[in-house]
Amino acid sequence: MLNNNAVVVKENGQERIVMGPGIAFGKKKKDPIQATKIEKMFIPSFENAEQFKEILTTTPLEIIDLSERIISHAEGELQTPFHDYIHVSLTDHLAHAVRLASEQLVVHNRLAEEIRLLYGPEYAIGEWAVLEIERALQVTLPKEEAANIALHLYNARQTHPNMATALQTVTLLNELREQIEVFFGQTIETSSMTYYRFFTHMKLVLARIEQGETLHDMDDVILSAVKTRYAEAYACASQMGNWLTVELDTRVPESEIGYMALHIERIRPDLERSSTYENL
């Protein structure tokens, strides 16, 4: 027995973890479990079985219950299966986040904006989860916690890449945004549609580079016009292209830099408006 709501059982010689409200209340070892009380059943992998057991025995029940509610809500909203390890990773993360909040310690996530744009459905669930946690536990979580939860959900989706791949994409996009801000000395208005178009374009560029696919091609005449007409934007894009070449060990062609420059030029009015708002 792990706690009143979770217990380890064996079926056909295979160890399983079953969960349900009060499923183990008043039970002793080897007592039968009522099938009608089982809400969830897991067959933990060899790698996470002991972690799962430890978390279920050491984490406050209200955290476990919240984690399971979030996972169930996410499964319904996203209509996708999750890897079983989400029950370990998310529960452990929430316990840590709540502990920090209770100690009034704030850990900021500098990638939160990129996560919001990249993983919108998961981020929306993260926002819902933050409100649920705050309401249930009477704590105040940092705004970025929605992004942290979103990343856990995204990486637990069985059809998606692992945490390392997702984090690399988020980190690269965050770095590219910061390069533009440093180059022009102004802050990007990330909620604008023009920035979203640039963000989406760069996300596709990174995906094509990762998959070894051909990037955009641009007519030489148009490329020459972009260099002349949008010289500053092209210089910024060229700097970003050189950085990506080093980071990804793949040359970014000049034509792709031209497309990046066009997107950068389109977001420059948003840069100026954002800077104006900050100076008021």
Predicted features and spans:
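A cross-family "folded-core" feature that marks the main globular domain of proteins
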Residues: 1-280
